[in-house]
UniProtKB/Swiss-Prot annotation:
One of its GO terms (molecular function) is phospholactate guanylyltransferase activity. This is Phosphoenolpyruvate guanylyltransferase. The gene is fbiD. It comes from Thermomicrobium roseum (strain ATCC 27502 / DSM 5159 / P-2). HAMAP family: CofC. Pfam families: CofC. Phosphoenolpyruvate binds at residues 137, 153, 156. Pathway: Cofactor biosynthesis; coenzyme F420 biosynthesis. It catalyses: phosphoenolpyruvate + GTP + H(+) = enolpyruvoyl-2-diphospho-5'-guanosine + diphosphate. It comes from the Bacteria. Keywords: GTP-binding, Nucleotide-binding, Nucleotidyltransferase, Plasmid, Transferase. Belongs to the CofC family.
Length: 200
């Protein structure tokens, strides 16, 4: 199943403000760019990903997207759910059977996790990867692209599950080490360092 894969990224000056106790603004912005570029490289290595879009209101990131060889879907900074609705419309316009949303702050992401998520996807269906707290959503795959409305935010895991039940479509959850950890707080940053140290 061919998909449009999108990576949502906030404006650089607003991104990762909760990391302020651990990182200066320039370091936070560099981290956001690095993670976004890494996510795009991983998506490009997955054959089922037909088109990649960077979902951002930030003009500087839009210029980087061009350099990275992906299209920019400019959202109007009204929030992640509005941005994902824009991506849903784009996937339908491209006549692609599925949409994949991968948050751009997953430092342990790998191609196998993406392939696994897409292998689980049925149509009509939803695949979601929860965060490490078991309440959020770090990856969401939808077939068809508009099978449910996006419900990112607090307790999004449960809201996406309810939406899938309401749509009477298959829902599968993927618990993956590569997908559970998103970088939001100094605690997350320390956890990533511990995981990487343990791999050496």
């Amino acid at each position: 199943m061919q998909v449009l894969a999108v990576v949502p990224v906030q404006r650089l000056e607003q991104a990762k403000s909760r990391l302020a106790p651990a990182l200066e603004p320039a370091a936070r912005q560099a981290l956001v760019r690095e993670l976004a570029e890494r996510t795009i490289r991983i998506l490009r290595s997955v054959p089922a990903v037909a088109v990649i879009g960077l979902l951002t209101p930030d003009p500087s990131l839009a210029s980087l997207a061009s350099r990275w060889g992906v299209r920019t879907l400019r959202d109007a900074a009204h929030g992640l759910n509005d941005a994902v609705r824009l991506a849903q419309a784009e996937a339908c316009r491209l006549h692609l059977p599925a949409l994949l949303i991968v948050l751009g702050d997953l430092p342990l992401l790998d191609p196998h996790a993406i392939r696994h998520a897409l292998a689980l996807l049925e149509s009509p269906g939803v695949v979601l990867a929860p965060d490490r707290h078991g309440t959020g959503t770090n990856l969401l795959a939808l077939a068809p692209p508009d099978v449910i409305a996006p419900a990112f935010g607090p307790f999004s895991r449960w809201r996406h599950r309810r939406a899938a039940a309401g749509a009477r479509c298959t829902i599968r959850e993927l618990w993956s080490r590569a997908l559970v950890l998103d970088l939001d707080t100094p605690e997350d940053l320390a956890l990533v360092h511990r995981v990487r140290e343990g791999e050496r």
